[in-house]
Amino acid sequence: MVDRIEGLGPLSQSGKTQKKSENNFSEALKEALEKVNDIQKKAEKAADDFAQGRISNIHEVIIEAEKASIALRLTVEVRNRIVEAYRDIMRMQI
């Protein structure tokens, strides 16, 4: 015998889950951008301190600048991937 197909559960519950995941993603993105900004500020401060003679070790300045450069490149690449995924979704036919 064939079993009866049960109805779907309430739709409002899935909306709550989606809202929660949206908040998690937006919060994670915000925190990541704040970290990149902090790294950029730290590199800029190290360069200023070196220029004013407060830091004598150029290696520290170069390391901070490279960290900032890598963080920025990674951020740009993540943004590019997000935009690409959004465009792919927008091109999908329903």
Curated annotation (Swiss-Prot):
Which keywords, in A-to-Z order, does the entry hold? Bacterial flagellum
Does the UniProt entry include the keyword Aminoacyl-tRNA synthetase? no
Chief localization: other
User: A GO biological process this protein is involved in?
Assistant: bacterial-type flagellum-dependent cell motility
Which molecular function term from Gene Ontology is one that the record holds? Answer: structural molecule activity
Question: Which domain of life does this protein belong to?
Answer: Bacteria
Q: What name is this protein filed under?
A: Flagellar hook-basal body complex protein FliE
Organism of origin: Thermotoga maritima (strain ATCC 43589 / DSM 3109 / JCM 10099 / NBRC 100826 / MSB8)
Recorded name of the encoding gene: fliE
